Design a protein with these regions (language model features):
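Short acidic DE-rich linear segments
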Residues: 1-2, 62-70
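Short, charge/polar-rich alpha-helical segments
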Residues: 1-13
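Generic leucine side-chain signal with a strong bias for well-ordered alpha-helical environments
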Residues: 8-11, 25, 57
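Heptad-repeat alpha-helical rod positions in long coiled-coil/spectrin-like domains
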Residues: 13-16, 23, 27-30
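Amphipathic alpha-helical coiled-coil segments
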Residues: 18-22, 45-65
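Short, charged, amphipathic alpha-helical segments
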Residues: 36-47
Length: 70
């Protein structure tokens, strides 16, 4: 099992990656490189992953914060 701090850093990197993917997706849509259907499909996929990561981040921040009391 990974160290909690290490896992927290990994989640932060994943969050940044998803933000960059969304930015790139928006640029592609604005340049008309993808259809609206492709955009919506990929956007939903990224949003689901983002929500998962943010949920885990909140949990890990709580856990890491609790560990400082011991």
């Amino acid at each position: 099992m990974k160290d909690a701090q290490e896992y927290l850093k990994e989640l932060l990197r994943k969050k940044e990656e998803l933000e960059k993917r969304m930015e790139l997706l928006n640029k592609k849509k604005n340049k008309k490189q993808i259809t609206d259907e492709e955009y919506q499909k990929e956007r939903k996929k990224i949003e689901r992953e983002f929500i998962e990561v943010m949920d885990r981040l909140a949990q890990m921040r709580y856990i890491v914060g609790q560990n400082t009391f011991y």
